[in-house]
């Protein structure tokens, strides 16, 4: 047990967060985010659900093998197969944790598990005992704990603590509770659970009623000392408690809570930006702590007050969360050493071969735009290290568009194919982007159903890079592709091809599975 005022931050962006539609990440993106979370100072990184799929297993195994500075956890149902898979996935971690769970509420016992209280209790104890054979650090979660009988929670937590659990987690799985209820429940559990003084109580709050952060703070007041959260509050349905909001609430209102975390708050904004770039999903402008408007002041009255004294309308300093105007860091005359130094200060550790690729892409971009910002460099790095391996490669594209009643936008593309050939196709469409996607679909020979398409600027100025995100469906599976360029049509084409290249990987895996 640590000091009573230390709060452990358990980040589940890579597991609960990544399960949300539109937030899927490829393996390299997951590893990059895991490294950033370790630099941020989170205590536990829940890297995934190893038994969910071979890809999830490999992602957890890769993170456990290379990320240091934080405990690496994998999620496992209370079954032998799940726990053994999780143990293998985290075995290379510096500090491995198995996080096992079983549903405990009457609703889940009856309709999900078809088990009675005694069976659930026995399953929970057996799961913890099995997990302890592999690791010393075992966390147990009572799924849907908030809707579970409090006296039964006391019984089951007492039993799993006796079986060897070091952390017991109380999830508000459906975001149903209120702060007063959460505070009272945690206080009761701390009083009545046998062995409570030997473990850490944890909260895991969902945001269905917009109360995830408030409920998490209430849990801390009730005696919890671990908070489970995600960067930007991502997660299933309405999301999870937002890491940045929890951490800054504790820091800003220390006089009320008297609690500290190990988070380096100056890395909060860069971490938020990294997640946005990996997933292509922006936070809303008025998002607390990391939104574009979080430290903006439009009102004349507010601006006047800010000029007089900053604290009249700001309770935090932007610099405290790592937010400052993106500095102009490099230009076309900058050399390799300056680039590598800047990337290192941004938190990127690249192999020499990756640095060479980034430098080449940087020089090409510097010829197109005068000012290179951190966000530009970040997009280059993620494009080099984070995407699917190129299979179809865009060689050229041409768009002809016109306005008026007789307009008929036309797009033609030339691609290098996976087998080394070149293919050219053209198509007309309702607009230039539609024509472009139709031409690309013909060229790759696959019918991809477009679900959504959006593009955003990732830096500043009229020559800023645009990042296009394509969400598409193929054979019942959803895929997300991203592309970045100073030309928004080229960015759109690259995003579409990113989806196509991911499909090739899926087809290859399916072929191997059938052959096996």
Task: List PLM regions with ranges.
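Mixed-charge, glycine-accented linear interaction segment located at domain edges/termini
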Residues: 478-480, 484-513
